[in-house]
Every structure is written in C-alpha cells, then in structure tokens.
Swiss-Prot record:
Keywords: Iron
Keyword check for Membrane: no
Pfam families linked to this entry: Iron_traffic (PF04362)
Role this protein plays: Could be a mediator in iron transactions between iron acquisition and iron-requiring processes, such as synthesis and/or repair of Fe-S clusters in biosynthetic enzymes.
Protein name stated in the entry: Probable Fe(2+)-trafficking protein
InterPro entries reported for this sequence: Fe_traffick_prot_YggX, Fe_traffick_prot_YggX_sf
Quaternary structure, from the entry: Monomer.
GO cellular component, as recorded: cytosol
Organism from which the protein derives: Escherichia coli O6:H1 (strain CFT073 / ATCC 700928 / UPEC)
Length: 91
C-alpha cells in the first residue's frame, strides 16, 4: 500500500518512498519529505554528477560532495551544475 506525503521538492502531495533509502537523520528526512518522483529526478542528476565529475563512491570526500549536492537539490532548490551539459529546453 502506497503512502502519500507532501513533497518538499515538488511542493505538492505525491507518493512517498516505500522504505528509507538513505541512512541516518538525512534518510529519515528524505523518507518523510521526498516523493518517489522527486527521488527519481535526483537519481538522474546523481548519475550525471558521478559520471561527469568521475566520482568514486569509495572515496569519502566524493560521497560527502554528492550528499551536499543532494541536500542542495532536494531541500534548498539549487540546481545541480554539470559542466558541459545543456538541458534540452535551453538549447
């Protein structure tokens, strides 16, 4: 059975996560405030960041950078800047 939450990112009611996807207090916040749709948008950005910046998830500094980008994107409304990438609608 799906749960409905008010998604902080989308600013509307949406389907919530089925379980906590990220550890710790930040994970609890994501579970309670971020919808499946918003999380999918983040995953797309995250993949681009990892690939373009050649991040290694075994490197603690790279994980910290990615986590900060996630917080900025999901909770602070900041767009993820990926060098050399131009969104389709801005071409």
């Amino acid at each position: 059975m799906s749960r409905t939450i008010f998604c902080t990112f989308l600013q509307r009611e949406a389907e919530g996560q089925d379980f906590q996807l990220y550890p710790g207090e930040l994970g609890k916040r994501i579970y309670n405030e971020i919808s499946k749709e918003a999380w999918a948008q983040w995953q797309h950005k995250q993949t681009m960041l990892i690939n373009e910046k050649k991040l290694n998830m075994m490197n603690a500094e790279h994980r910290k950078l990615l986590e900060q980008e996630m917080v900025n994107f999901l909770f602070e409304g900041k767009e993820v800047h990926i060098e050399g990438f131009t969104p389709e609608d801005k071409k």
